Amino acid sequence: MPVKKILIMGLPGSGKTTLARALAPKLGAVHWNADAVRAEINSHLGFSEKDRIEQARRMGWLCDQVVKAGHWAIADFVCPTKETRDAFGECITIWVDTIKEGRFEDTNKLFEPPVKYDYKVTEQNSDFWAKFLAEDLDFYEKPTFFKAILKGL
């Protein structure tokens, strides 16, 4: 079964949420925005390394529940370190790398560009990227003829 859990990550102000909002309806995905989840569910968590890792773990868990129900799940948040990305779990990672510095100096200092990612978005054009990603991800989900034959064995 293909991975249907998507992490859209990058610096604050890079266009993560805009891209997630454009991509979600194209995939029929549930979209979790980290700022909204933090405000409504995880308001007791701060921005320490430990709390950031816990926020990432919980965001990953929310997405996992959606995927278990058979749907695409998208989470958009900074996910600034390898540890936070590891805590989020296995996923398709879309790195929105459209700015060199975000709004928050502490996040700029903490942010580690990912070594591994599936897609790198380099310009703020959410309509273009959402269409491109949806088409590519939809292709990714469809079985190939070879897989269909093997599945029938």
For the regions a language model picked out, list residue spans one by one.
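Glycine-rich phosphate-binding loop used to anchor ATP phosphates in small-molecule kinases
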Residues: 48-104
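Short, charged, surface-exposed secondary-structure boundary motifs
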Residues: 41-42, 101-111, 129-132
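Conserved substrate/cofactor phosphate-moiety recognition/catalytic segment
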Residues: 20-62
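Conserved lysine of the Walker
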Residues: 16
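Residue-level preference for the first positions of well-ordered beta-strands
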Residues: 3-7, 30, 72-74
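The conserved Walker
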Residues: 12
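Residues at the C-termini of beta-strands that transition into short coil/loop
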Residues: 35, 97, 122-125
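NTP-dependent small-molecule kinase module
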Residues: 1, 6, 22, 26, ...
